[in-house]
């Protein structure tokens, strides 16, 4: 945690702040006691329980992308051989959802009753499994094809021989298995909060029997930059709020 005052006088105060966090978590002394859960979860999620592993590890079969000639996905076995056949026995750790570094940095400013502050939240490193791509670009049922879908399901899927696409041919309606193709680096910078304010202690307030007048305005998450393009606000409503306050002290 860092808090540093760049300028400090009777009328002016300018400071900066920075905090950061890094965490590493590993399993110990599990042995084979959770092997039954590892086997059961292979087609359900990316979490496995092994000694020395992390609860944030993302397990999947490695993918070499979509074959331009056939529109089928090419997988890698544990030995590094290419194959069209997906086998969960070939899964390895393909990422970790825990960031390498995350925290908040910002600055605050005061000058003769005026105040302003801005804070940014950052996340560097780590990966994410793209559920939007997995469930709404591929793995779309025939009936769902007639409904509104992510536009990438139309524009980014394989369409013709030689087409270098990110997603398999839409004609292949079999279920897409979990692979590293849906794991992406997850770096984020968010404008977490911004606020401005003013406080006046002028003698003119005494006419009203008041000692001070304050005004404040606040906005949260005023922008967001991310290395992934994913849906937000599906499971929990996403909100960007703006608030104002006016106070009179007697």
Language model region names:
Residues 16-18, 118, 215-217, 246:
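Membrane-embedded beta-strand positions of outer-membrane beta-barrel proteins
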Residues 123-214, 219:
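Extracytoplasmic gating/loop element in the C-terminal half of outer-membrane beta-barrel translocons
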Residues 25-41, 45, 125-153, 225-232:
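Outer-membrane beta-barrel and related beta-rich outer-membrane complex signature
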Residues 10, 113-118, 203-206, 242:
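Repeated loop/turn-to-beta-strand initiation elements of outer-membrane beta-barrel proteins
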Residues 12, 99-103, 187-192, 211, ...:
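Residues that define the transmembrane beta-barrel architecture of outer-membrane proteins
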Residues 6, 20-26, 111-113, 122-126, ...:
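Transmembrane beta-strands of outer-membrane beta-barrel pores
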Residues 5-97:
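Conserved small-residue
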Residues 38-70, 151-163, 176-178, 218-250:
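C-terminal beta-signal and terminal closure region of outer-membrane beta-barrel proteins
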């Amino acid at each position: 945690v860092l808090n540093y005052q760049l300028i400090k006088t009777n009328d002016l105060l300018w400071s900066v702040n920075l905090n950061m966090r890094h965490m590493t978590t590993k399993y110990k002394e599990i042995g084979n006691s959770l092997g039954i859960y590892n086997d059961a979860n292979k087609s359900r999620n990316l979490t496995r329980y092994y000694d020395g592993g992390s609860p944030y590890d993302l397990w999947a079969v490695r993918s070499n992308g979509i074959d331009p000639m056939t529109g089928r996905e090419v997988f890698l076995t544990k030995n590094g051989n290419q194959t069209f056949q997906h086998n969960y026995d070939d899964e390895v750790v393909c990422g970790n959802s825990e960031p390498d570094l995350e925290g908040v940095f910002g600055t605050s400013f005061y000058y003769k009753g005026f105040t302003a502050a801005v804070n940014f939240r950052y996340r560097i490193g780590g990966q994410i499994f793209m559920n939007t791509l997995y469930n709404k670009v591929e793995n779309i049922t025939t009936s769902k094809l007639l409904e509104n879908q992510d536009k990438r399901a139309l524009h980014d899927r394989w369409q013709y021989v030689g087409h270098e696409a990110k997603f398999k041919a839409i004609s292949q309606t079999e279920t897409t298995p979990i692979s590293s193709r849906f794991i992406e680096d997850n770096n984020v910078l968010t404008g977490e909060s911004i606020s401005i304010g003013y406080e006046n202690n002028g003698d003119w307030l005494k006419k009203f029997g008041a000692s001070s007048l304050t005004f404040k305005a606040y906005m949260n998450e005023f922008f967001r930059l991310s290395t992934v393009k994913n849906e937000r606000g599906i499971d929990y409503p996403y909100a960007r709020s703006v608030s104002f306050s006016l106070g009179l002290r007697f």
